[in-house]
Amino acid sequence: MVGNFLKGNPVNASLPSTHSNQYAQDQVNALDPRITEDCLFLDILVPQQVFDAPKTGSGVPVLVWIYGGGYTEGEKTYYSSPSTGPAGLLRRSNNNIIFVALNYRLGAFGFLSGPTLAASNGTANLGLLDQRFGLEWVQKNIHLFGGDAKRVTVMGESAGGGSVMHQVTV
């Protein structure tokens, strides 16, 4: 049995696999109709007790989530487990944090680069700029929701973790 795998027996490629009246099924998956370039949205989850509290103090800590998906798929509600999702994190914080999740452009729309793009004065890595825009928005506006802009933690999973590294080094 093992000998067959080691020898590399030739395959008879002379037999037809499809006939002229047959066709292969389309291998391209149908696009999700919700997919759009218009994706710069934030979810801001504020516990009721934080939202109702007077906005006189420094506010509560803020946790910003950047999802993973290989920079090609995903969205702001993409969590690998309930414990890393907003409900689990808010529960473990005794409802004393604000959770922010942001979307960003993916695939070629978000991470296109190369000499042709550079020669045409295009902007590479727009997905990272989308993330930066979201983080800047949080810095400017989170106090309106009871958050402390000086206590913002950014976390991510997989490509989201890589994005955090890129945001720190840019």
Model-assigned labels for residue ranges:
Residues 1-33:
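Surface-exposed, low-complexity/disordered Ser/Thr/Gly/Pro/Asn-rich loops and linkers
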Residues 29-170:
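Serine-hydrolase-like catalytic core of hydrolytic proteins
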